[in-house]
Regions:
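Auxiliary, metal-adjacent structural segments of Zn-dependent hydrolase domains
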Residues: 5-61
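Catalytic Zn2+-binding segment of zinc metalloproteases
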Residues: 74-75, 88-109, 116-122
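Active-site scaffold of zinc-dependent metalloenzymes
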Residues: 45-77, 89-92
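C-terminal end-helix/capping segment
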Residues: 24-35, 62, 68, 105, ...
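Long, well-structured alpha-helical subdomains associated
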Residues: 120-142
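Short alpha-helical catalytic segment bearing the HExxH-like zincin motif
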Residues: 80-88
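Residue-level detection of beta-strand scaffold positions
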Residues: 83, 113-114, 118, 126-127
């Protein structure tokens, strides 16, 4: 029996989400992760709804914060948006913000964890493109 009463606040240090759209999407994303069979303890930093530092849809910053621009995210189908959120949650869970490297290895590792959690990362990548090194990543982590 799946538990639908998941208190997502227990998984985050701090949450600043204003829009109902992002609240619902985060709830669905966390619920899917919790029920994926993933056996490690889930622990994430802060979630901030608003503009990202580098101007993209979502990012994890050095200070253990996931920033999401819900206005941009809202342009994607729900399964793509959830895969994108899961990808950023994977970066945070794996603590990639502590050991950022100027290559794409962590992008592939985050994709694989999001895939393990049951998200359609392949559709996300088909729609948004393969991971690539770009100025946004360099700006966030410099």
């Amino acid at each position: 029996i799946l538990c639908l009463n998941v208190d997502i606040e227990r998984y985050f240090e701090h949450i600043e989400i204003e829009s109902d759209y992002l609240k619902i999407l985060f709830f669905k994303t966390i619920l899917k992760i919790v029920h994926s069979g993933f056996r490690q303890d889930l622990s994430f930093g802060s979630i901030i709804e608003g503009q990202t530092i580098a101007g993209g849809v979502a990012e994890v910053t050095r200070d253990h914060c996931i920033r999401i621009d819900s206005r941009q995210l809202n342009q994607f189908d729900e399964d793509i948006a959830m895969a994108m959120i899961a990808h950023e949650l994977a970066h945070d869970h794996l603590r990639h913000f502590k050991h950022w490297t100027p290559n794409l290895e962590n992008e592939h590792i985050a994709d694989n964890l999001a895939r393990q959690w049951g998200f359609n990362v392949d559709r996300f990548r088909d729609f948004c493109g393969a991971p690539r090194m770009n100025n946004r990543l360099l700006q966030i982590h410099s």
